[in-house]
Amino acid sequence: MSAPTNITYRKKARELVVTFSDTEFALSAEYLRVYSPSAEVRGHGPEERKLVAGKKHVAISSIEAIGNYAIRLTFDDGHDTGLYAWNYLRELNDEFDAYWGEYLKELKMANASRLPQIPLAGGAGIGSWTPGQ
């Protein structure tokens, strides 16, 4: 697969714009983070995939080219182990509706949220509160 002709990060919108010779699309930082191709998130098979919650406001802090086949994204939550190959970026775009719908369903089943948890003051880690729950 040929490399993109351009990759731009829109900081305010928190989205990665990927341009290939035949198409252009934008993927949110949240979507890229929860569908990171790293073994840490994906595991070694579908049954090992980890549900990543609380990333609605995550941002991309750096983009690094990996040869001529992928990019490494570093997120502001410290995650940096996923290599996003060109075909995987296309797949994330092409399958967005199915993948995002599945993610939202998994969150609901796990009683989890896209919003980050906020530690309770004075509790020294004795609890947390998630807005909207």
What are the residue ranges of the model-derived segments?
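Motif-centric detector for short Cys/His coordination patterns
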Residues: 1-133
